[in-house]
Amino acid sequence: MSKQPRKQRTRTETAPLHERQRAVRATLSDELREEYGQRNVRVNAGDTVEVLRGDDAGHEAEVVTVDLTETVIHVEDVTIEKADGEEVPRPLDSSNLRVTELNLEDSKREARLEEGDEQ
């Protein structure tokens, strides 16, 4: 790995999707941290998150989509108004979110969490 910032930026911008998953990790709430023994987790659609920063700070809602190409997360009822009045989802960075409830419909994800090896 290079130390040069321009090469670091290029690497993150051109990273394949399976590597970009690491860029959409958010911290777990204290209760979940105790339960699973890990500090953060990859955010999936269906997880419930709390917005920590910005105009919508304190808002708690379900994740609608996780966009790996842009490494952004869209949360239910967190929108921004366009110039023509249309409401569109506001893209949020995972560092500004805290996961308060996990979507455990995926049995493989649940097994990884129990092992303490969530990717």
From Swiss-Prot:
Gene3D superfamilies assigned: 2.30.30.30
A GO BP entry: translation
One MF term in the entry's GO annotations: structural constituent of ribosome
CDD domains per the UniProt record, alphabetical: KOW_RPL26
Pfam families tied to this protein: KOW, Ribosomal_L26
Keywords: Ribonucleoprotein, Ribosomal protein, RNA-binding, rRNA-binding
Keyword RNA-binding: yes
InterPro entries per record: KOW, Rib_uL2_dom2, Ribosomal_uL24_CS, Ribosomal_uL24_euk/arc, Ribosomal_uL24_KOW, Translation_prot_SH3-like_sf
GO cellular component: large ribosomal subunit
Biological role: One of two assembly initiator proteins, it binds directly to the 5'-end of the 23S rRNA, where it nucleates assembly of the 50S subunit. Located at the polypeptide exit tunnel on the outside of the subunit.
Similarity comment: family membership: Belongs to the universal ribosomal protein uL24 family.
Quaternary structure, from the entry: Part of the 50S ribosomal subunit.
Protein's name according to its UniProt entry: Large ribosomal subunit protein uL24
Natural source organism: Haloquadratum walsbyi (strain DSM 16790 / HBSQ001)
